[in-house]
Amino acid sequence: MSGKPPAIFLMGPTAAGKTDLAIELTKVLPCELISVDSALVYRGMDIGSAKPSREVLAAHPHRLIDIRDPAESYSAAQFRTDALQAMAEITARGKVPLLVGGTMLYYKALIDGLADMPPADAAVRAALEAQAQALGLTELHRQLAEVDPESAARIHPNDPQRLIRALEVFQVSGESMTAHRQRQFAESSGADAGAGGHLPYTVASLAIAPTDRHILHQRIALRFSQMLEQGFVDEVRSLRARSDLHAGLPSIRAVGYRQVWDYLDGKLTENEMRERGIIATRQLAKRQFTWLRGWSDVHWLDSLACDNLSRTLKYLGAISILS
């Protein structure tokens, strides 16, 4: 093993069983948990994000859960800063950071770093969110293609958070996000843990998922139905009662929340909301698989196996990550 301290990434698609395995690992290894999930950062968004229960969190604390109000944005850059601080604190106590979740952009930000982009501008962002509401995301994507075609080619037209951020960077700085990244890459050769540097840890990357994709789809449908039974609609209704929340915010655009919001807006029937929520979650899982297929040195585990804890411990022992 190198001189860098160890860290463990436990990745995988939604509904794969990441949290359960992570908790089992903390019972036998000197690990502390860090959540890697863009929905779990928001307070008051518990049911639709499949947030661990209060009892579970009390027994097995996760850092970076409930750290933002739904009216606030939370970027990959902010996550990287927060996660690096949490990892350093855990390491200083002689423990191992165990990062668990499915927001693959956050993992990539940790591993590869991020270009040093201009900070968020609340006024510019509000104006862009208003445009998105009034004109639609297709128009924002067209605007981005005019000023930053490279970013437009990378960002899906239905990804409001990344579209708005790319346009925000251009409007605030006068330079495209692509130009910022290219300059940062040229300047940051040899950097370590800065915004554009690499992660100063030796990482064991694990991914868990059912080998049968049909099983994952069944799990997704079952979990969405369970969320509805647990009061998901009422949770979103409470969010809608706040005057500072709207459908253009990153929190409300989260999978599941946007479909229930549209249902409460009268845009969808209950059956349509359920169907679209399940489809959107399956699409999220597909994107997560796409990220993971391109991930180097990842060790796969089958969600359906009954001995994943022992398999994980055997793998970690084989690569001497904790020695």
From Swiss-Prot:
Cofactor section: Mg(2+)
InterPro entries assigned to the protein according to its UniProt record, in alphabetical order: Dimethylallyltransferase, IPT, P-loop_NTPase
Binding site for ATP: G12, P13, T14, A15, A16, G17, K18, T19
Chain positions recorded as substrate binding sites: T14, A15, A16, G17, K18, T19
Entry's EC annotation: 2.5.1.75
Site (Interaction with substrate tRNA): T103, R125
Domain of life per record: Bacteria
Reaction it catalyzes: adenosine(37) in tRNA + dimethylallyl diphosphate = N(6)-dimethylallyladenosine(37) in tRNA + diphosphate
GO MF annotation, one: tRNA dimethylallyltransferase activity
Keyword Chaperone: no
Region annotation Interaction with substrate tRNA: where it falls in the sequence: 37-40, 161-165
The protein's role, per its UniProt record: Catalyzes the transfer of a dimethylallyl group onto the adenine at position 37 in tRNAs that read codons beginning with uridine, leading to the formation of N6-(dimethylallyl)adenosine (i(6)A).
Family membership: Belongs to the IPP transferase family.
PANTHER family on file: TRNA DIMETHYLALLYLTRANSFERASE
Quaternary assembly: Monomer.
Name this polypeptide is given: tRNA dimethylallyltransferase
Native source organism of the sequence: Pseudomonas putida (strain W619)
